[in-house]
Amino acid sequence: MAKRIKTPADIGALVRIVRKEQNLRQDELAGVAGVGLRFIVDLEAGKPTAQIGKVLQVLQTLGCSIDILAPGERRK
């Protein structure tokens, strides 16, 4: 599922959707991702100041990846 991300809230919504698809509770995701429960709660709420390293850690744990396109590039 490719999803265009424009805001922290978009990332949070994606994390919530994928977490639920994997039948994980927030505390379970926090444990396997190596972050705190509060971080997952804040991330899913779209907190704009979430630490990028931890965000990437959570996304990787869920099996998600990020592709960043430079201006003028197109998706393949």
From Swiss-Prot:
Residues 15-69 form the HTH cro/C1-type domain. InterPro entries: Cro/C1-type_HTH, Lambda_DNA-bd_dom_sf, Tscrpt_reg_HipB-like. It holds the Pfam family HTH_3. GO terms for molecular function: DNA binding. Residues 26-45 bind DNA. Keywords: DNA-binding, Plasmid, Transcription, Transcription regulation. This is Uncharacterized HTH-type transcriptional regulator y4mF.
